[in-house]
């Protein structure tokens, strides 16, 4: 699963004292927790907001828009305005060219067109950058930070395909179809340069998956090293872990939540097992009893004894006596037994003519005095022997089942050699049924086939009777633990990254947004350390939640281009005539002598300070 192939030179550099940091069973589980494998609760959904790259996209958009629109001079804007005004004067009669409403309309048309053109140029090309596929992944960066506090980064060269895309981007940014407007050309050229830098930076750095990196700690040099595909790569240790006695404890949110997450997960697993075991609700306690044991003895004697077996006859007598609850019934049974037995005896008194009691009377007396006691002792002995045999039988059956389970586990699925079937056994284990997510029938079958658990449901067997029955539906409560884990996730993420919740009028949280501290803690290292975008300014928390259209309006309103256009408007279309006409152009002579002195007193058209910058 993990790509840990380090070349010989690299492994020699590690030395025998290197402590493995990742991948280890503990570190891998941290990433699996982020992927929702263990006890995914509602509070973990905040993490989805945290790793959303929307804030970074707004930061790139703000940087490109602000840098491009600020790369214009007052001379370029003035040149474009003069060119536009000259075209308007050619199209309209000269008598109307100096009318106040006409001047306002002309300037408003030009300023609005300039704004739309610049906005169209910038947004179209910036969107292509934001929505194009880049190698650098902000989501993986957040995963590494939240799991380990360290971020590996791989430098890679720019591909030829990317060079071709950058070249085509230059043609779109220069905007040849817009004519010879200096302002647009300056903005487009600067947009291309800024975009090229962003694209090259985002595609020259790669953050690998957690399954592709090996991280180790070197105690001798007190440094962490990372390897990717056999070669050493950069490793940004933002939050160093604690290492004690060879055990690594990361300084990360998921590491702090680890124990609580697995406590909740094991409780859910326990609840699922109880649910499966209690699918059949009727349970019974089964024990040994001798109430109907005589039937088994009679069946045994019937199969193994002779046709006329005295033990069988006497046992039948005892059975009949036990089934009769009245004195008359017992008397009838004894009389019947004596009659049957006396027919097979020789009456010596009748044969030799001796007086005294008859044979039937003597037999009756004998039965009443001694036979019953002897037979009872013998039957008790038989019962003890049968009970011992039954217990011995159950013991051997358990041993046979255990041996069969061990033999089946040691052999392969098809009964093959363990060495030959090792890959198949590993594959079967990997594809085993998950108790939490598997089907109920498969999970029950897995539980009852487990050799380590004596779980089963059976009907009472020989010499067993139901002593008590009850309904068992116990399932461990897990809702409270899940709720506590949700609150713990929220508290950890909010306090670690200083997130700001956004709530509605009812106080329900809609989503979370980046605060200024979040941008400094999370977005700052990604921008300057990982992506190496040193010219990019960190976005403010206000822009982090605004829409793109709102960001465009704010950036344009405070841009250099908007200030220059506003200054031209004040001079060309003054608010009142008392303040003097600070128009850019001289009033046409066709107006007559209505304002000769005023026209002559116009100031020189000097650009404002910093106009050439």
Swiss-Prot record:
GO terms for cellular component: host cell nucleus; virion component. Its main location: virion. GO terms for biological process: chromosome organization. InterPro entries: Herpes_Portal. The keyword DNA repair does not apply. Keywords: Host nucleus, Viral genome packaging, Viral release from host cell, Virion. Residues 592-605 have a biased composition (Basic and acidic residues). It is found in: Virion; Host nucleus. Residues 577-613 are annotated as: Disordered. It holds the Pfam family Herpes_UL6. Homododecamerizes. Interacts with terminase subunits TRM1 and TRM3. Forms a portal in the viral capsid through which viral DNA is translocated during DNA packaging. Assembles as a dodecamer at a single fivefold axe of the T=16 icosahedric capsid. Binds to the molecular motor that translocates the viral DNA, termed terminase. Belongs to the herpesviridae portal protein family. This is Portal protein. The lineage of its organism: Viruses, Duplodnaviria, Heunggongvirae, Peploviricota, Herviviricetes.
